[in-house]
Amino acid sequence: MSQDNDTLMRDILGHELAAMRLQKLEQQRRLFEKKQRQKRQELLMVQANPDASPWLWRSCLREERLLGDRGLGNPFLRKKVSEAHLPSGIHSALGTVSCGGDGRGERGLPTPRTEAVFRNLGLQSPFLSWLPDNSDAELEEVSVENGSVSPPPFKQSPRIRRKGWQAHQRPGTRAEGESDSQDMGDAHKSPNMGPNPGMDGDCVYENLAFQKEEDLEKKREASESTGTNSSAAHNEELSKALKGEGGTDSDHMRHEASLAIRSPCPGLEEDMEAYVLRPALPGTMMQCYLTRDKHGVDKGLFPLYYLYLETSDSLQRFLLAGRKRRRSKTSNYLISLDPTHLSRDGDNFVGKVRSNVFSTKFTIFDNGVNPDREHLTRNTARIRQELGAVCYEPNVLGYLGPRKMTVILPGTNSQNQRINVQPLNEQESLLSRYQRGDKQGLLLLHNKTPSWDKENGVYTLNFHGRVTRASVKNFQIVDPKHQEHLVLQFGRVGPDTFTMDFCFPFSPLQAFSICLSSFN
């Protein structure tokens, strides 16, 4: 009997526990439904419209997406040209205009120009952390830093001599692009009036948009004409300041001239090899930035470097690419116009940088052949030219402080053209002539000595806001006779992003090669 009673008591307790669990679950479900009802009754809560048809809305979105990605409807897929060379008014294709039967047009959100250009070209916008330049002079510290990677630039088929370039918009100018797209959006907005009884609603909308677009083009032409006149006068003042003809504000104008005047860009059909070998125009400053790509298995030891030119229209245009050779006894960098085919056998190979065994002296060559191997090549091969040399020396403190740099360049003639130096043996090279003391026809430049900051205990250089991070790779090249006149400066602005500014007598290839030597 006792066993039967115990079994009965266990069954009763089990049923009671199950009933309690069911009651708790029911209570939780009621509380959850109550909270959901309270949320639906709030004023700011978005509620679904049962009368709307989701199928029609999804079909419209699908049609707009197909029209936007189709080659015939997208102007950027017709030719691989930069957005800056498209005719005016074609940027209106970046925003979608849908007109209904009642003649009212609704303009969708315009796609940013940078994203549109890179999406259609199959690219990724390179990461760049730009900081605003302050009016006060900024002092940068010298220390060692390492970081992440920047993606490579646009893709281009190898074995084709490059002429012109592709362009993408700088991240700092996004506000300008948004304002331009907003202006174009205002041009396509129809006024609050119905269509004429004798005309279709779509025709009325297009006519009004065309008239407003013409007015906008006239205003832009007038502003551009006034802007070119003012910029020409400003450039004239800056060029006078570079020559030392200024008055009381000549020092300020000289600094502004060293950073503000930019070299004109080549056209789409201009030979890029001749452009990168030609020295910059006197009185102009070419502002560039350099990115380093460490992605991949072997790029940690042999990274890729890409050089972009910053133009006056706030665009970055690809100039050169360089990489370190894998199977080489000394440090050897190959430089090409093609970012995807950096080989000596490629058609876009333009030069190389070679060092000695200790990586203290570097020589810059063009794409000619070695005179010792001339008999192994075809008879039409041209003997290589020496475009410059760089010597690194330790300072008084040994290797603890910044290095001393001496840049040796061939001289220029009266037409500001570089004198050809084609040595047939080692004794005729630029480094041998410099070591012998034969400096006739040579231009010697040195790096600016950093000042010691006692408070922070570091060496500092004034980069005027163009360099924002401390690094031992930061340097400035000056003329020994004019210490305040910068001809080349290089410094870090991101983990793998650097700025490079240079002027006459440097060419883009020479400046890029000197900066590559500092990475070794």
Curated annotation (Swiss-Prot):
Residues 224-233 have a biased composition (Polar residues). The keyword Phosphoprotein applies. PROSITE patterns: TUB_1. The keyword Secreted applies. Its main location: cytoplasm. GO terms for molecular function: protein-containing complex binding. It is found in: Cytoplasm; Secreted. Keywords: Cytoplasm, Phosphoprotein, Secreted. One of its GO terms (cellular component) is cilium. The modification Phosphoserine is found at residues 135, 190. Strongly expressed in testis. Also expressed in retina. Expressed in cancer cell lines. Residues 211-223 have a biased composition (Basic and acidic residues). One of its GO terms (biological process) is protein localization to cilium. Pfam families: Tub (PF01167), Tub_N (PF16322). Transmembrane segments: none annotated. Belongs to the TUB family. PANTHER family: TUBBY-RELATED, TUBBY-RELATED PROTEIN 2. This is Tubby-related protein 2. It comes from Homo sapiens. The gene is TULP2.
